[in-house]
């Protein structure tokens, strides 16, 4: 187990998460007593208690007053906030994890972008209006793409879509910085923003879902061609 965290709390958190992931503490099992666990990890009981509370909030553990702390099946109890952690824990599964994230993004984007164009076409035009002026770089496009999709999500009238995009932000933008290093991906995105603005201007909301899905397929094809070169540190925030 290689743990990169510098602070005692960070070390304890990574130790516990990796132990759960590697089935040292499998789902359904009980964690050792607080004193034993703090000695095992090498942190104070106060630090350990803070870490356990944080992991419980993220769905990794269930803490019950007067009872031992139980390890959860995190797939069933955690939220989008653990995506980056999962990507870091299992690099070999990163391509599949990202495929799943992109599929979800395309499916929900088809819904919320159609709703945004139908209900607030002028707002949609404003959201994509500055896209042609974006700096021609991977970082700039990754930030722009996230901001556009998030703004469209909040423009649809259902803020839950926006909250989903908030939850995807970390992994979304890191993947975006790698994906948009491809000039073809940047050109495709600009064409998408432009056409979306045209559909909003002409109030053609009924054509949006197919258009977004088509964009998802085209961008997915580019992404699949880049998967073999995914940097190992993509999920750590250094890519």
From Swiss-Prot:
SMART domains: HTH_GNTR. Residues 34-53 bind DNA. PROSITE patterns: HTH_GNTR. It holds the Pfam family FadR_C. It is found in: Cytoplasm. CDD domains: WHTH_GntR. Gene3D superfamilies: GntR ligand-binding domain-like (1.20.120.530), Winged helix-like DNA-binding domain superfamily/Winged helix DNA-binding domain (1.10.10.10). GO terms for cellular component: cytoplasm. Keywords: Activator, Cytoplasm, DNA-binding, Fatty acid metabolism, Lipid metabolism, Repressor, Transcription, Transcription regulation. Residues 6-74 form the HTH gntR-type domain. GO terms for biological process: fatty acid metabolic process; regulation of fatty acid metabolic process. One of its GO terms (molecular function) is DNA binding. InterPro entries: FA-response_TF_FadR (IPR014178), FadR_C (IPR028374), TF_FadR/GntR_C (IPR008920), Tscrpt_reg_HTH_GntR (IPR000524), WH-like_DNA-bd_sf (IPR036388), WH_DNA-bd_sf (IPR036390). The keyword Lipid metabolism applies. HAMAP family: HTH_FadR. Multifunctional regulator of fatty acid metabolism. Homodimer. This is Fatty acid metabolism regulator protein.
């Amino acid at each position: 187990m290689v743990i990169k965290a510098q602070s005692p709390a960070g070390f304890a958190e990574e130790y516990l998460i990796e132990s759960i992931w590697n089935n040292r503490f499998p789902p359904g099992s009980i964690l050792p007593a607080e004193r034993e666990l703090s000695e095992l990890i090498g942190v104070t009981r106060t630090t350990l208690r803070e870490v356990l509370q944080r992991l419980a909030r993220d769905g990794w553990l269930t803490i019950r007053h007067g009872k031992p702390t139980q390890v959860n099946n995190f797939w069933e109890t955690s939220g989008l906030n653990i995506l980056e952690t999962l990507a870091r824990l299992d690099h070999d599964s990163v391509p599949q994890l990202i495929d799943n994230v992109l599929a979800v993004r395309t499916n929900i984007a088809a819904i919320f972008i159609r709703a945004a164009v139908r209900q607030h076409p002028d707002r949609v035009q404003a959201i994509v209006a500055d896209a042609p002026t974006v700096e021609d770089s991977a970082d700039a496009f990754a930030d722009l793409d996230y901001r556009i999709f998030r703004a469209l999500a909040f423009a649809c009238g259902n803020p839950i879509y926006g909250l989903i995009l908030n939850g995807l932000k970390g992994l979304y933008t890191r993947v975006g910085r790698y994906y948009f290093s491809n000039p073809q991906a940047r050109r495709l995105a600009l064409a998408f923003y432009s056409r979306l603005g045209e559909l909003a201007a002409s109030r053609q909301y009924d054509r949006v879902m197919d258009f977004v899905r088509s964009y998802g397929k085209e961008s997915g094809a580019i992404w699949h061609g880049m998967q073999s070169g995914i940097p190992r540190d993509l999920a750590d925030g250094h890519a």
